[in-house]
Amino acid sequence: MKMKILYISPENTVGTLTLWKKEHESRGNECRTVTFFASPKNFKEDICLELPFNFTMPGLAKLRNIFYKRYRGREGYFKIKEGNPPIWEPEGWLDKTFLKFKDWLWRPIVEKAIDDYQLYDFDVVHFESGMDFLKNEFFVKELKAREKKIICHYHGEDLRSRGVMPYIDTVADLNLTNEVDLLEKHPKLEYIFLPFETSSFTPKDKLNDIIRVAHAPTNRFYKGSDLIISVCSKLESEKLVEFDLIENVSHADALERKAKSDIFIDQIGDKGGWGYGMNSVESLSMGICTLTQINETYNTFIPHHPFTHVTKNTLDTELRRLINNREKILTSGQNGKKWVEINHDIKNVSNKLYDYYSSIGLLC
């Protein structure tokens, strides 16, 4: 039976919306994706509303953080919110007033999109970030009244800094995440691996004459980039490596540069979530030796992972060890390619999603 599947998301952040649309359609279903803002990495859009006040933009994000320091202290917006799950609410009169104004501004654009694309007619609606168009959650309420299936997919700040939206959390048929640390933040959260077309890349079979190390942060604070840059720059000054800091470029350019590396470093620390994300999924798919910090809980969750574990105290030593063992770099990359195909390939991840669909009563 053909299903109509809708995704609603602030942005097509790492390209997964495009991937899911393609996969659902390959299974004979209809799929549309609606984003509030255009992708900062130029991923393909389906329905993009181009709404004002995009707080993922650096300038507005910085302004928001300064504002939240008034209520949350020195850490501002990045302060971890308490609760299981933490629940969103406006923080003070000014926040409440601004959000009412923003919703007033957004509502006619949203309502037009609902009518133009018949968004109430879908069988299942995925809310990436677990968030309705507006803070009054009018769209979710109408979906519930029409007995549509509602799925929330939480990422990073959604639970760490913001919290669940009060109404959607009570009516969601399924809550999903790709991030292991978030499982501790919500009692009804299920895990699913981040999907990727792992077959898009041929794994490398030889290394550069001088080992090339890459790091590609979207947020230096979250990735522990200052330390990574410092260590790699020191090794580069010793002429042991070539260091490529990939940032503020298109996704296509980032992939091209990443593919030329021999070692990829994802993150140090747990400030922006545990372990790894799409950056590592891409590098593993390229057959690149990938370094990141994997804490004990994550190590238990994925015990046979291919990552080289590093911390702020071991990064320099680990890099020097790898530089002197080129065969280890190649072997690690080959093992990573096999692992990522099993766990992250879109075909395998979609099978898991369709199992979840069946569990909530959708006829797949």
Language model: regions and residue ranges:
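Active-site proximal beta-strand in glycosyltransferases
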Residues: 124-130, 140-159, 174-177
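Short N-terminal targeting/anchoring amphipathic segment
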Residues: 4-9, 98-104, 114-135
